[in-house]
């Protein structure tokens, strides 16, 4: 399985500057390799007993990634077709990052992802 490396801080900044994932969930340009292969997956969770969201952004071409956890913004609704498709695998999602991203890539290539995101304020 291919190991992933992290986007550099300047690449993460470029990802945030060049894209608004909440408006468009399609793949976009990777600041590292130049391929249109950057994908994002959001997962609802709880952190300190409060609603939270885990965000993973990765490039399917050069295998760079970034992840973060933060509070779930009020009014943000995230569909999670993976959870509906395979609840057992979804529960074990973070046991191995290489397996996680391989699984997310398969779901993307099979048309299960990207997710839909609705933000009502």
Model regions: which residues?
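Short linear interaction motifs
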Residues: 11, 40-42
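Short, flexible, mixed-charge glycine/proline-rich loop motifs
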Residues: 16-27, 47-53
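Short cysteine-rich clusters marking metal-coordination/redox-active sites
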Residues: 30-33, 59
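Short, non-ligating residues that shape and space the ligands of small metal-coordination modules
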Residues: 39-40, 68-69
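Cysteine-rich micro-motifs
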Residues: 51-66
């Amino acid at each position: 399985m291919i190991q992933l490396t992290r986007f550099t801080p300047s690449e993460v900044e470029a990802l945030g500057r060049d894209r608004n994932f909440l408006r468009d969930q399609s793949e976009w340009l990777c600041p590292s390799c130049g391929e249109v292969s950057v994908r994002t997956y959001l997962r609802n969770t709880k952190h300190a007993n409060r609603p939270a969201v885990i965000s993973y952004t990765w490039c399917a071409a050069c295998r760079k990634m970034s992840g973060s956890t933060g509070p779930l913004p009020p009014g943000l609704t995230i569909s999670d077709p993976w959870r509906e498709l395979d609840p057992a695998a979804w529960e074990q999602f973070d046991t191995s990052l290489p397996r996680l991203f391989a699984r997310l890539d398969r779901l993307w290539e099979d048309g299960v992802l990207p997710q839909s995101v609705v933000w009502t304020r």
